[in-house]
A protein has these predicted regions:
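Regulatory and interdomain segments flanking nucleotide-handling catalytic cores
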Residues: 1-184
Length: 184
């Protein structure tokens, strides 16, 4: 066996392929985006249209970078992509899918921002449509909780509370109470 063949064995030791006829959902998540968005680029909290537009640019790029994407869902610094269950791009190599989606997101986002933004990617292999629905309900629920908490936190800070006071006030508070706090 040649040195190249031996090295390829080591290199591919962790290669796995997603099983056919399963849905793949990739979650591409911004790395250290709190620092990037608040400290380095001073995006407005809890929501900044400029940041949203950058994430839309990245998501659109991901939908057109060689994978058969059926749905893209954005929340905050995260993009979830539902890949066609029959997509055989790169032989469904999970390592390739993970690395390329993270790299493509980084490239498109960074070019649009004019500075480097990094992403990681994880992959869910889902056997049924019901599990796909569960996945997107989970992400939607997370988006709702995060947005509600961020708006309440921002309101408490705007009213003069310190970061510690706002955090303590919201700790353990039910979503319904947070809603009432915002709309009282």
């Amino acid at each position: 066996m040649s040195v190249a063949a031996r090295m390829r064995e080591f290199e591919s030791a962790l290669d796995q392929r997603a099983p056919p006829e399963n849905f793949l959902v990739a979650r591409i998540d911004g790395r250290n985006f709190t620092r990037l968005t608040r400290e380095r680029h001073r995006f407005k909290a809890p929501f900044d249209e400029r940041f949203r537009d950058l994430m839309v640019i990245a998501a659109r790029h991901l939908m057109d970078c060689g994978f058969r994407v059926r749905l893209a869902y954005l929340q905050s610094d995260e993009i979830s992509l539902l890949l066609d269950k029959n997509d055989a791009t790169f032989g469904r190599s999970m390592r390739k899918i993970l690395s390329l989606l993270a790299a493509e997101a980084r490239a498109s986002f960074s070019v649009a921002l004019g500075a480097v933004g990094a992403f990681d990617c994880r992959l869910s292999v889902l056997p049924t449509v019901d599990r796909v629905v569960d996945y997107f309900l989970w992400r939607q629920g997370d988006a709702f909780r995060n947005a509600l908490n961020a708006y309440c936190y921002g309101m408490l800070r705007d009213q003069g509370g310190s970061a510690e006071e706002a955090t303590a006030h919201l700790r353990g508070m039910a979503s319904s109470a947070k809603h009432d706090l915002l709309f009282a």
